[in-house]
Regions:
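A conserved short beta-strand
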Residues: 134-146
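Hydrolases whose catalytic domains are alpha/beta-hydrolase-1, hotdog thioesterase
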Residues: 124-128, 150
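Short beta-strand/loop motif that positions the catalytic acidic residue
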Residues: 164-166, 170
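Gly/Ala-rich beta-loop-alpha elbow adjacent to hydrolase catalytic centers
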Residues: 117-121, 125
Length: 222
């Protein structure tokens, strides 16, 4: 995918409360079958700790091919490990270009960037965030996994701290994916922490948001 052929994406925004320049950039990547309007709903809650942050939740660039509505970062047809890593690799230029453009738009450096993703969006947050030449401040993955963990050692460029949360009743991405992802991250030298949420399915609950807010507060520079 050449630079000129990379699809341009955008989505809903939540601007800094004070109306001035953003002090941080928090990018929210939605899951399969949703769009940016889904995760931008997290912005008002996270903005309590980051009133001067700019939030943006871009719409993925592909129509979902396994549901009648919504979007996808890549096709999940086949649901194999190979499908996931190839899909993440193909979508990475779209996400990386967007992150670069948003940092430039806000006049911010990478250490003021956090990438937060749910499910397939979390896969993209991890895949891209660990391969960026300029490391983001941190990454958050809700109900997700790391595509192609066996490729990480050879391709990793950044080691930002990572938070993972996962419901133990998740029927979409099994809960055992989280400790596997955490182990792969730590083996590559990435600081990672996690919490399993009892009774939670494939989703984000209030505790997940509390954990994310605390994690971002510790790692995202003001």
């Amino acid at each position: 995918m050449s630079e000129h052929s990379v699809p341009q994406i955008d989505g809903p925004r939540h601007e800094p409360a004070g109306g001035g320049p953003a002090e941080q950039l928090i990018v929210l990547l939605h899951g399969l079958g949703a769009d940016g309007n889904d995760l931008i709903q997290l912005a008002p809650m996270l903005a309590r700790a980051f009133p001067e942050a700019a939030f943006v939740s871009p719409h993925a660039h592909q129509d979902c091919d396994v549901a009648p509505v919504g979007l996808q970062w890549f096709s999940f047809k086949g649901e194999s490990d190979q499908v996931m890593i190839q899909g993440a690799e193909q979508a990475a230029p779209v996400v990386d270009t967007f992150l670069d453009q948003e940092l430039e738009r806000q006049g911010l450096t990478a250490d003021k960037l956090a990438v937060v993703g749910f499910s397939q969006g979390g896969m993209m947050a991890l895949h891209c965030g660990l391969r960026r030449a300029q490391p983001p401040a941190c990454l958050v993955g809700f109900s997700t996994l790391l595509p192609g963990p066996e490729k990480l050692d050879a391709e990793i460029k950044s080691k930002p701290p990572v938070l993972l949360t996962h419901g133990d009743q998740d029927q979409i991405i099994p809960a055992h994916a989280m400790p596997q992802t955490e182990a792969a991250l730590k083996a590559a030298g990435v600081p990672a922490e996690s919490e399993t949420r009892p009774g939670l399915g494939h989703g984000i609950d209030e505790r997940c948001l509390e954990l994310a807010s605390d994690f971002l507060s510790r790692h995202l520079a003001g």
